[in-house]
Amino acid sequence: MFLPVYQGQKYSYSYEVGTGNYMLFSNDYKSHFYLQGDDARIFEEEIERIDNLPPPYSNDGRLTENAISVYL
């Protein structure tokens, strides 16, 4: 079961409960990518790094969307 974590203007991602995996996708559903294992861990670390940036960069959705677009 996937839980939505982030929904941006172009890209979003969901977390798969119980596995630690992520599903990245474009909001038009034309592209998606399933992250598991080390890839999921690296993605999670990148999102945590973005979330911990100081203002004015903290909570900047563009940085999160850029991180997702790298995988797609």
Feature roles, as predicted:
Residues 1-23, 27-31:
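Short N-terminal "domain-start" leader segments
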Residues 30-33, 41:
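Short, surface-exposed beta-strand-loop junctions and turns on beta-sheet-rich folds
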Residues 37-72:
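Mixed-charge, Lys/Arg-enriched low-complexity segments
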